[in-house]
């Protein structure tokens, strides 16, 4: 997916936390969002920046920084952020939210993983499961 990312880089006041050399050589991440007004926000790597009104684009070294910055943006009621992985070849991959819905939200199409239709009190006795050959989550 060779998607072109657009937007202005936020204005930095002081330390930005910077990109690591590894981020340029191996891969880097980008987060994009749209802001209704210019406002100051905290960077996950330390420091602060001022986002522009309209589209914003910020390159970061790790996906976790993007997730943390998304948490900061939610304090400003900005929920339309997207995180991309950018490889040195220029290939851009959309990675968060992967299916268009944030993990903590309910999505009718999202399948349940390791779901058991029982309450905690109905769980089997661990001593009976231990040597039965079954995994505890399959019992």
Swiss-Prot record:
Residues 119-139 are annotated as: Disordered. Keywords: Photosynthesis, Photosystem I. Gene3D superfamilies: Photosystem I PsaD, reaction center subunit II. One of its GO terms (cellular component) is photosystem I reaction center. GO terms for biological process: photosynthesis. It holds the Pfam family PsaD. Belongs to the PsaD family. PsaD can form complexes with ferredoxin and ferredoxin-oxidoreductase in photosystem I (PS I) reaction center. This is Photosystem I reaction center subunit II. It comes from Trichormus variabilis (strain ATCC 29413 / PCC 7937) (Anabaena variabilis). The lineage of its organism: Bacteria, Bacillati, Cyanobacteriota, Cyanophyceae, Nostocales.
